[in-house]
Amino acid sequence: MAVYTDINEIELGAFLRHYDIGTLTSYKGIAEGVENSNYLLHTSSGSFILTLYEKRTNREDLPFFLGLMQHLAKRGLECPQPVVRNDGAMIGQLAGRPAAIVTFLEGMWMRRPTVAHCEAVGEGLAHMHLAGADFPMRRRNGLTLPDWRPLWNLSRKCADTVERGLVAETEADLDFLEKNWPADLPQGVIHADLFPDNAFFLGDRLSGFIDFYFACTDILAYDVAVCLNAWCFEKDFSYNRTKGAALLRGYTSVRPLSEAEADALPVLARGAAVRFMLTRLYDWLTVPAGSFVVKKDPMEYVRRMRFHRQIESAAEYGLEMQGVAA
């Protein structure tokens, strides 16, 4: 979450007249994040999050994102719920931006996730996949295999300035993924960006997921692969198999993986590492100093790519046989 668009109390008050959430008592910007402008609102009836959607978010996708949160909450998944305006809409206009209000989710994200946190996230992700199974809307993943080569081409010329040999490495990975990407695996709604800062905890208990603005329809096991990359590597870039086993155990306790999904996990994890390396690399090379966009080191994901190249089976990530459906 972040603040790119400033708002004043007068325009905020006018905006809030379209909602039945009580009287505004205070508001403040939330500094973390990169995509949209976010404010914490305190009113006489509770706390809420106000989001102003910036240029990186396609307005046409907002009904999918907000509708998904509404659907998941109705299915019992802990996540922010969109607050419906008095006119029945979920999206308004504030400071020249599309804007929405969602309920406040209690908890904190874990900067150093433990094994217990990883298991809870795996279990929660599986519950999300099951809860989203009957969500009627679809959204194409705009950052999946067919999109990686065009994105890479925007950075390719300068990639070796980040590390010598990165062009050859990335070309080889893309060639491999294009030849080996799995087909016919179970699909559904995925979060697609479930990093530690998008999962809240109260102690070791998962209190819910936030930031569904990359959610889409894609391979369910790809979401698991994203989480292995996001949750199970240490600061020294080593893979923590104990955390990986816990995450996979949590997931498969709710939704066992098929044999085909388990077999595909090394390719999916390698692809997820490439996806996040490419977006980081593009921002690293193109975002000017002083920009609001926080640049993240692409080399963290180059090291993950190198790790996944050595993996031959999901067992090496910690997947146990009882987690695979017969």
From Swiss-Prot:
Pfam families linked to this entry: APH
UniProt-listed SUPFAM superfamilies: Protein kinase-like (PK-like)
PANTHER family, per the entry: AMINOGLYCOSIDE PHOSPHOTRANSFERASE DOMAIN-CONTAINING PROTEIN, AMINOGLYCOSIDE PHOSPHOTRANSFERASE DOMAIN-CONTAINING PROTEIN-RELATED
Family statement: Belongs to the pseudomonas-type ThrB family.
Protein name as catalogued: Homoserine kinase
Reactions mediated catalytically: L-homoserine + ATP = O-phospho-L-homoserine + ADP + H(+)
Annotated EC: 2.7.1.39
Keywords from the UniProt entry: Amino-acid biosynthesis, ATP-binding, Kinase, Nucleotide-binding, Threonine biosynthesis, Transferase
InterPro entries: Aminoglycoside_PTrfase, Homoserine_kinase_II, Kinase-like_dom_sf, Pseudomonas-type_ThrB
Enzyme class, first EC level, given as a word: transferase
Originating species: Brucella canis (strain ATCC 23365 / NCTC 10854 / RM-666)
UniProt keyword Transferase, yes or no: yes
Keyword Kinase recorded: yes
This protein's pathway: Amino-acid biosynthesis; L-threonine biosynthesis; L-threonine from L-aspartate: step 4/5
Gene Ontology biological process terms, A to Z: threonine biosynthetic process
Domain of life, per lineage: Bacteria
GO molecular function, one term: homoserine kinase activity
